[in-house]
């Protein structure tokens, strides 16, 4: 079990053979900042979480390597540091398609009336999703790509991955 605080990651362990309320121990395994507004997601052997980076969002790929006793979080947005704005609210994971989607809120939208087919939607972050595609070959990541999908006259209010609505 991997747990997040604003500044660290912890793994649940036990001081005994089984985990009980008296034997449970939280071990700090890394000290990456974490944006508490965005829930981390698991994707296979990895966990993805976001960080605030100046006026943008960074995404980290957390992994644990039992062979080397390493716990690390690689910045998968290091090559696209200004791509994702700082108002991300959700990361969706799809292990079938080997992809993540980051959704951002529409802080500039002040419309309070329900949207209709005739309502003009301004070009804000709510009509955009940021997709991260990756490919592993025999346990080694061999290809990654970020893309930005802007959908005209649409306001993205959530997403569904593997029957889970966000």
Predicted regions located by residue number:
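Beta-sheet-dominated scaffold domains
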Residues: 1-166
């Amino acid at each position: 079990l991997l747990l997040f605080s604003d500044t660290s990651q912890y793994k649940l362990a036990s001081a005994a053979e089984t985990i009980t309320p008296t034997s449970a121990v939280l071990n700090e395994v890394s000290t990456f900042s974490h944006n508490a507004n965005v829930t981390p997601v698991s994707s296979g052997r990895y966990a993805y979480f976001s960080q605030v980076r100046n006026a943008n969002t960074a995404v980290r790929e957390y992994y644990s390597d039992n062979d080397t006793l390493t716990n690390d979080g690689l910045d998968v947005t290091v090559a696209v540091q200004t791509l994702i704005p700082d108002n991300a609210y959700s990361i969706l994971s799809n292990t079938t398609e080997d992809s993540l989607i980051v959704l951002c809120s529409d802080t500039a939208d002040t419309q309070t009336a329900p949207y209709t087919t005739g309502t003009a939607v301004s070009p804000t972050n709510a009509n955009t999703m940021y997709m991260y595609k990756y490919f592993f070959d025999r346990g080694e990541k061999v290809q990654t790509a970020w893309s930005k999908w802007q959908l005209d006259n649409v306001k993205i209010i959530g997403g569904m991955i593997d029957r889970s609505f966000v």
